[in-house]
């Protein structure tokens, strides 16, 4: 059973905003360290950023998939398609994080790795916006004329 914060738009939105804000800040900090040529510290910051994605963003995705999405579909079976798309977004985020972990071991903080970190931000922002729209906004009822 999903916790109450997942079921309320304002609380769910706050979780999304907090998670994304933290990821943006940590990404910017890592990039600033690279600009200052603090490569060792930047690499540590990248490791912390990966951990942040796993423990904050992806753990939220896991919680959604472990009950919240099922509850939403049980309440409205028409949401099954939307939930499938949202779950796919989570899979994309997981894949990007896994790719970053492999690439960073092979190439360090290469431009490709930095692009992947930015891809996470974009996918997550779009996913959160779509999730809030698809699962929380009530459809406008058609007026009978």
Regions found by a protein language model. Name each.
Residues 1-145:
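Small-residue-biased structural context
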């Amino acid at each position: 059973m999903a916790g109450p914060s997942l079921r309320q738009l304002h609380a769910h939105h706050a979780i999304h905003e907090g998670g994304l804000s933290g990821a943006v800040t940590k990404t910017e900090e890592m990039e600033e360290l690279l600009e200052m040529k603090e490569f060792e510290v930047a690499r540590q910051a990248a490791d912390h950023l990966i951990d942040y994605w796993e423990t904050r963003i992806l753990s939220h995705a896991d919680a959604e998939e472990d009950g919240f999405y099922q509850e939403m579909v049980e309440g409205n079976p028409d949401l099954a398609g939307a939930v499938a798309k949202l779950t796919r977004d989570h899979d994309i985020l997981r894949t990007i994080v896994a790719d970053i972990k492999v690439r960073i071991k092979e190439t360090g903080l290469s431009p490709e790795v930095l692009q992947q970190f930015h891809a996470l931000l974009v996918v997550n922002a779009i996913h959160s916006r779509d999730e809030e729209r698809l699962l929380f906004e009530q459809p406008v009822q058609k007026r009978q004329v």
